[in-house]
From Swiss-Prot:
It is found in: Secreted; Endoplasmic reticulum-Golgi intermediate compartment; Endoplasmic reticulum; Golgi apparatus. Pfam families: UPF0556 (PF10572). It comes from Bos taurus (Bovine). The lineage of its organism: Eukaryota, Metazoa, Chordata, Craniata, Vertebrata. Belongs to the MYDGF family. The keyword Signal applies. This is Myeloid-derived growth factor.
């Protein structure tokens, strides 16, 4: 099953949109944009499913959850960064290994959001580090839905170093 159109970078337009959104947020005065929250956590091998989650926004309106299983090596330090737009209608969740490429073999992964719907989601086999750039997974290796970015069983090649999600608040009916 193909990923919903417009949710992933196929032509570069979504990357441009995300870059512009992030640049606009970076150029605004600090007092008008919520401070991003970055939390370090260990990604642990052993084949057991683990989860890590964080909340952000007024009243912890949004949640980002990273669920995974991996093999090989030892624990790796990863980070989850969350931030909201000035009007709190958009939030970003970035999960990554700051040292670039992970040496763990991921058997599965899923990054999901609560309280919002994904407008852009991307997964990378290698995160930017020093002079190296992000290397995205192939489109067939992962899927993006309204609430999650996750591996495609049988197609995912077990390399993961970064996930990026930009989501918009779900509308609440009166």
């Amino acid at each position: 099953m193909a990923a919903p159109s417009g949710r992933r970078n196929g032509s570069g337009g979504a990357n441009l949109w995300v870059s512009l959104l992030l640049a606009a947020a970076a150029l605004r005065p600090v007092e008008t944009v919520s401070e991003p929250t970055t939390v370090a956590f260990d990604v642990r091998p052993g084949g057991v499913v683990h989860s890590f989650s964080q909340n952000v926004g007024p009243g912890d309106k949004y949640t980002c959850v990273f669920t995974y299983a991996s093999q090989g090596g030892t624990n790796e330090k990863w980070q989850m960064s969350l931030g909201t737009s000035e009007d709190h209608q958009h939030f970003t969740c970035t999960i990554w290994r700051p040292q670039g490429k992970s040496y763990l073999y991921f058997t599965q992964f899923k990054a999901e959001v609560r309280g919002a719907e994904i407008e852009y989601g991307m997964a990378y086999s290698k995160a930017a580090f020093e002079k190296e750039s992000d290397v995205p997974l192939k489109n067939e290796e992962f899927e993006v839905t309204k609430t999650a970015v996750f591996h495609r069983p049988g197609a995912f090649k077990a390399e993961l170093s970064k996930l990026v999600i930009v989501a918009k608040a779900t509308r609440s009916e009166l």
